[in-house]
Amino acid sequence: MLSVSGLTKRYGDERALDDVSVDLQRGELTVLVGRSGAGKTTLLRCLDGLEQPDDGTIELDGRAPATTDVALVFQAGALVDSKSALSNVLDGALGRLPSWRELLGVYPADEKRAAIARLHDVGLGGYADRRVGTLSGGQRQRVGIARALQQEPAVLLADEPVASLDPETGRDVLERVAAVVRDDDLIGVVSLHQPRLAEPIADRYLGLADGRLVLDRPAAALDREDITAVYDD
């Protein structure tokens, strides 16, 4: 379980996060919604360790998360276009391996097998040798997900992973995320501007408004008014 308690983040006089507390469970995909500037990205960056909160705590199974425990997939993917899909996925293991392996491009055989398996997990098993720069937007996002999984995290975060994709491709990417969260028993959190895309696969919804947690509800108990209230808050 990932436990967030009293999380507060300030930028000057502005509170980007205001006393956020929530427990996130393994095997569940949580969808984070809210208007632009509501605090979604700040929350994900704090969970990933890219930002340090001013107050509050984050614990994974009762301890402080290690760097490799949490993986974050960005909207743009942050991939290297000149490298193959397989090489990009292998980069996800760098937090667990000596840095000289990246410089020389030498990875253990078991890491290569795992990376190929991750590409299969996201539906790109036949794309290992393709340069990322030649892939479509949806394929790039799936490579980014595979790379995050190569890190062997307990927590998988994705910040607006389908914002630049058409609805059909976006649904496919979200279905891939949901599948690996459940199959690998991960804690999954995805922020979205289009919450309807996640309706078939979400387990839980969290809503932020002005840095405050204003919605926490199982997907089965959610109605349209709940989502509307988050954006009207």
UniProtKB/Swiss-Prot annotation:
Keyword Endoplasmic reticulum carried by entry: no
Compartmental location: Cell membrane
Domain ABC transporter: 2-227
Domain of life: Archaea
Keyword Kinase attributed: no
A Pfam family per the record: ABC_tran
Topology in membrane: Peripheral membrane protein
Alphabetically ordered keywords of this record: ATP-binding, Cell membrane, Membrane, Nucleotide-binding, Phosphonate transport, Translocase, Transport
Positions contributing to ATP binding: 34-41
Chief location bin: membrane
Catalytic activity: phosphonate(out) + ATP + H2O = phosphonate(in) + ADP + phosphate + H(+)
GO cellular component terms, semicolon-separated: plasma membrane
SMART domains (UniProt xref): AAA
Any one Gene Ontology molecular-function term assigned to this protein's record: ATP hydrolysis activity
Major enzyme class: translocase
EC number(s) given by UniProt: 7.3.2.2
Similarity comment text for this entry: Belongs to the ABC transporter superfamily. Phosphonates importer (TC 3.A.1.9.1) family.
Subunit annotation: The complex is composed of two ATP-binding proteins (PhnC), two transmembrane proteins (PhnE) and a solute-binding protein (PhnD).
Reported function: Part of the ABC transporter complex PhnCDE involved in phosphonates import. Responsible for energy coupling to the transport system.
Protein name: Phosphonates import ATP-binding protein PhnC 1
Annotated organism of origin: Natronomonas pharaonis (strain ATCC 35678 / DSM 2160 / CIP 103997 / JCM 8858 / NBRC 14720 / NCIMB 2260 / Gabara)
Gene name in the database record: phnC1
